Amino acid sequence: MPKMKTKSGAAKRFLKTASGFKHKHAFKSHILTKMSTKRKRQLRGASLLHPSDVAKVERMLRVR
């Protein structure tokens, strides 16, 4: 039986770390002039995936 392929879109967006999955914040790509400086600052950097979404991402990346 052939190997299962990972979802390539998910592989580009999530990175497995020891403490979970790292991901970039949404709403930070274009048309940022309307957004306040505070909101843009809060969306900077990466964050860990919420525990309720971990099972879905593991299935997409075939981690288990």
Swiss-Prot record:
It comes from the Bacteria. PROSITE patterns: RIBOSOMAL_L35 (PS00936). Keywords: Ribonucleoprotein, Ribosomal protein. GO terms for biological process: translation. InterPro entries: Ribosomal_bL35 (IPR001706), Ribosomal_bL35-like (IPR021137), Ribosomal_bL35_CS (IPR018265), Ribosomal_bL35_sf (IPR037229). It holds the Pfam family Ribosomal_L35p. Coiled coil: none annotated. One of its GO terms (cellular component) is cytosolic large ribosomal subunit. GO terms for molecular function: structural constituent of ribosome. Belongs to the bacterial ribosomal protein bL35 family. HAMAP family: Ribosomal_bL35 (MF_00514). PANTHER family: 54S RIBOSOMAL PROTEIN BL35M, LARGE RIBOSOMAL SUBUNIT PROTEIN BL35M. This is Large ribosomal subunit protein bL35. The gene is rpmI.
